């Protein structure tokens, strides 16, 4: 199960990033600036609908994503068959803690069978309450998830060191 993939996180505040020799990323986000970093790292992640799960009992939302590794340079010793650059994607897990509600907007009917392209995680204002926030996950084509949370507490962890891809995401502005 997805929930069994997570271990304990060392206590502390702020952004914590570690890279092991296999180049896998492990990051904890605790504030809005950290959330921006997580959003940048997850931009263009491909997520199967079946790989997202809200555990209301444990107040967490979990995702397994195939993220494009924007933070890594192209693979220097490798070209694709046309001589083009080769990039990397890594399988990663994302756990958003203290989630008390999930709201779907423009969500696909057959969402469990869908593959969604994550564009960004954004912090939205909390409507007239003394604590908490809303974290919005925006996907290509308009679907989004709004997670009501007690605080920003996100863990992102690569499961592997990455795999080559010759497809770099592009966006029309």
For the regions a language model picked out, list residue spans one by one.
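Extreme N-terminal basic, low-complexity initiation segments
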Residues: 2-8
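Short, surface-exposed beta-strand/loop "edge" segments at domain boundaries and coil↔beta transitions
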Residues: 69-76, 141-149
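Eukaryotic intrinsically disordered, low-complexity regulatory linkers and tails enriched in Ser/Thr/Pro
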Residues: 6, 14-44, 62, 112-114, ...
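Flexible glycine-rich active-site/ligand-binding loops centered on an Asp-His dyad
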Residues: 150-173
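Short, well-structured hydrophobic secondary-structure segments
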Residues: 44-103
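Intrinsic, low-complexity N-terminal interaction/targeting segments
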Residues: 32-44, 101-137, 145, 149, ...
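Short, low-complexity cationic-aromatic patches
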Residues: 49-62, 125-140
């Amino acid at each position: 199960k997805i929930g069994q993939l997570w271990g304990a996180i060392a206590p502390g505040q702020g952004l914590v990033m570690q890279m092991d020799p296999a180049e896998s990323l492990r990051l904890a986000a605790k504030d809005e600036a950290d959330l921006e970093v997580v959003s940048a790292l997850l931009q263009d992640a491909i997520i199967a609908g079946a790989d997202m799960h809200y555990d209301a009992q444990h107040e967490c939302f979990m995702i397994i994503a195939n993220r494009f590794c924007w933070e890594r340079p192209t693979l220097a010793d490798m070209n694709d068959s046309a001589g083009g650059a080769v990039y990397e994607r890594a399988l990663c897990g994302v756990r958003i803690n203290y989630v008390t509600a999930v709201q779907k907007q423009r969500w696909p009917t057959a969402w469990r069978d869908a593959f969604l392209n994550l564009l960004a995680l954004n912090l939205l204002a909390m409507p007239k309450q003394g604590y908490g926030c809303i974290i919005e996950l925006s996907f290509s084509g308009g679907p989004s998830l709004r997670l009501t949370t007690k605080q920003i507490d996100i863990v992102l962890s690569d499961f592997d060191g990455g795999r080559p891809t010759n497809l770099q995401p592009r966006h029309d502005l």
